Amino acid sequence: MKYEIDAKRRTVRVVPEREEDLYFVYLLVERGDVVRGWTVREYKPEGAKEGERVKMYLAVRVESLEYHKFRGSLRIRGPVVEVQEGVEGVKGRRHTFDVVPGREIEIEKAAEFPLDVVEEILKMAQALMPKVLLVSIDDEEAAFAYITALGVELIQVVHNASKGEESLFDGYLESVRKQVDELSRRLKPDKLVVAGPAMLVEHIARYIRGDKAPQGSGGLAGVYEFIRSGLYDELKTQMGVKAYEKLIHMAATSRESVAIGPQEVEEAASLGRVDFVLVLDSYIKESPEKAWVLLSQIYKTKGRIYIVREDTEVGAGIRAMGGIAAVLRW
């Protein structure tokens, strides 16, 4: 994602380049912000009988956001507070910005918002991590998962209706191939990985071209085995999986070396003790003022920040800890 921060004007100009970038824009935009950009809306000039769709530059004060990860869409709604000259009657009316890859918007933040942490968040979006379509297969089922820097999304599980009938097994593999073709067209992954028992992975290579990842299990269980394996360590680091694994280990072996929950993390941050923090995206959206001030404090003391999606395995663990947890320096 391309971005430019103007500290004097308190603005962040962003150009999302991938659907994943929309997630980071969603994290940054809060109620009360002013969002500017080019858009298209219905406009009826004075004296005209009918309105028409007109491209115009305007700004809205944000009242609500709607982010759909499955559709890869972000909508920002609010009343129009600025509009280009020559367009009468639009100011004060409500408008919806559809934020899409390739279209620039400018976000004006409130005076109390800590701009210093914004760049750290946007750097996460700039990390060019591979998008992986994982096919985890055994002789009973094939599980499809989409793995990006944002987390692991389980898409579908296809069951083998021909269990025990060797003559029909190739029909099962053919149905898996068709599903792979459909998902590849829709998701456009950078890599396709086939995981499962070694003999089956070799056999299905006749139907599907992709990286082979032989392992003990396939299907749904194989998805979790793949995530925990040493493959794609860089991806796991970006997702916060390795940080979470260290957090869990430290919590079990040296409880005083971790901070769990908002109160403990706030106390540690005030002393500059946070080495790294894992925070849920939902925690930020539920208490934005409090969360951003805390993250800024951690950032200023050289702490690393991992924002974790709630709908991931790591996210479920952090949710159980109160939405935020950290490993401490001393």
Curated annotation (Swiss-Prot):
Highest rank taxon of the organism: Archaea
Co-factor(s): a divalent metal cation
EC number: 3.1.-.-
GO cellular component: cytoplasm
Molecular function, one GO term: endonuclease activity
Keyword Methyltransferase appears in the UniProt entry: no
Alphabetized Pfam families for the sequence: eRF1_1 (PF03463), eRF1_3 (PF03465)
Localization per record: Cytoplasm
Gene Ontology BP, a term: nonfunctional rRNA decay
InterPro entries named in the record: eFR1_2_sf (IPR042226), eRF1_1_Pelota (IPR005140), eRF1_3 (IPR005142), Pelota/DOM34_N (IPR038069), Pelota_arc (IPR023521), Ribosomal_eL30-like_sf (IPR029064), Transl-rel_pelota (IPR004405)
Acyltransferase recorded as keyword: no
Similarity-based family: Belongs to the eukaryotic release factor 1 family. Pelota subfamily.
Complexes and interactors: Monomer.
Free-text comment about domains: The N-terminal domain has the RNA-binding Sm fold. It harbors the endoribonuclease activity.
Function: May function in recognizing stalled ribosomes, interact with stem-loop structures in stalled mRNA molecules, and effect endonucleolytic cleavage of the mRNA. May play a role in the release non-functional ribosomes and degradation of damaged mRNAs. Has endoribonuclease activity.
Protein name from the UniProt record: Protein pelota homolog
Taxonomic source organism: Pyrobaculum neutrophilum (strain DSM 2338 / JCM 9278 / NBRC 100436 / V24Sta)
